[in-house]
């Protein structure tokens, strides 16, 4: 058992038999009353995000989650296949386990897979990835005084807004947390 002072971003808590990862936390010491910890938790299995408050010093159950360096190989009909770089085992994850990370997975993409009791839980992507633009309309600056954007389809099939000067084949850097264009690669 651990206490609420051990809660940090990314820590996995076992609450009522469900694994939840801490997205945000805040230690609050009000002028009146006792201190408490306000958290935002994401259920690993369902993806549901909930707010939960713990009294300061309360006991919580921290779960050991192993992080494996992996490479994305391919997608078949019902799963995504990754290769563990330590022992070259193949790991299969369902679409719900991969979730929105599927928008940024290209062949041989390096990722981290979180596992609990040797069962894969979810995919952790790097903060940004480099992807190629496969389709976009030609951009026309025309009479704009400020830069504009246009839709572009990436090699993964994901569509984002990019500046007008981006053309088909351009490799761009995309923020995996927001899905926004960062810059040319």
Swiss-Prot record:
Keyword set includes DNA-binding: no
Keywords on record: Cytoplasm, Elongation factor, Protein biosynthesis
Localisation per UniProt entry: Cytoplasm
Functional pathway: Protein biosynthesis; polypeptide chain elongation
Keyword match Protein biosynthesis: yes
Species of provenance: Tropheryma whipplei (strain Twist) (Whipple's bacillus)
Family: Belongs to the elongation factor P family.
Family annotation (PANTHER family): ELONGATION FACTOR P, ELONGATION FACTOR P (EF-P) FAMILY PROTEIN
Matching InterPro entries: Elong-fact-P_C (IPR015365), NA-bd_OB-fold (IPR012340), Rib_uL2_dom2 (IPR014722), Transl_elong_fac_P/YeiP (IPR020599), Transl_elong_KOW-like (IPR013185), Transl_elong_P/YeiP_cen (IPR001059), Transl_elong_P/YeiP_CS (IPR013852), Transl_elongation_fac_P (IPR011768)
Gene: efp
Superkingdom of this protein's organism: Bacteria
Name of the protein in its database record: Elongation factor P
Cross-referenced Pfam families: EFP, EFP_N, Elong-fact-P_C
A GO CC term assigned to this protein in UniProt: cytoplasm
Reported function: Involved in peptide bond synthesis. Stimulates efficient translation and peptide-bond synthesis on native or reconstituted 70S ribosomes in vitro. Probably functions indirectly by altering the affinity of the ribosome for aminoacyl-tRNA, thus increasing their reactivity as acceptors for peptidyl transferase.
GO molecular function, one term: translation elongation factor activity
GO biological process: peptide biosynthetic process
């Amino acid at each position: 058992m651990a206490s609420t002072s051990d809660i940090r971003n990314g820590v996995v808590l076992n609450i009522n038999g469900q694994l939840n990862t801490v997205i945000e936390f805040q230690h609050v010491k009000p002028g009146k009353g006792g201190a408490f910890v306000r958290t935002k938790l994401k259920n690993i299995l369902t993806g549901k995000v909930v707010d939960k408050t713990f009294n300061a010093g309360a006991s919580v159950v921290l779960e050991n989650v192993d992080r494996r360096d992996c490479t994305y190989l391919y997608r078949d009909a019902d799963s995504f296949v990754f290769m563990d770089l330590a022992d070259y085992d193949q790991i299969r994850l369902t679409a719900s386990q991969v979730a929105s990370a599927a928008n940024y997975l290209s062949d041989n993409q390096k990722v981290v897979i979180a596992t609990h009791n040797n069962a894969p839980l979810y995919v952790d992507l790097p903060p940004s990835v480099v992807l190629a633009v496969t389709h976009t309309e030609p951009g026309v600056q025309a009479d704009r005084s400020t830069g504009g954007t246009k839709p572009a389809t990436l090699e993964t099939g994901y569509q984002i807004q990019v500046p007008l000067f981006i053309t088909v084949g351009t490799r761009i850097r995309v923020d995996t947390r927001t899905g926004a264009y960062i810059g040319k690669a």
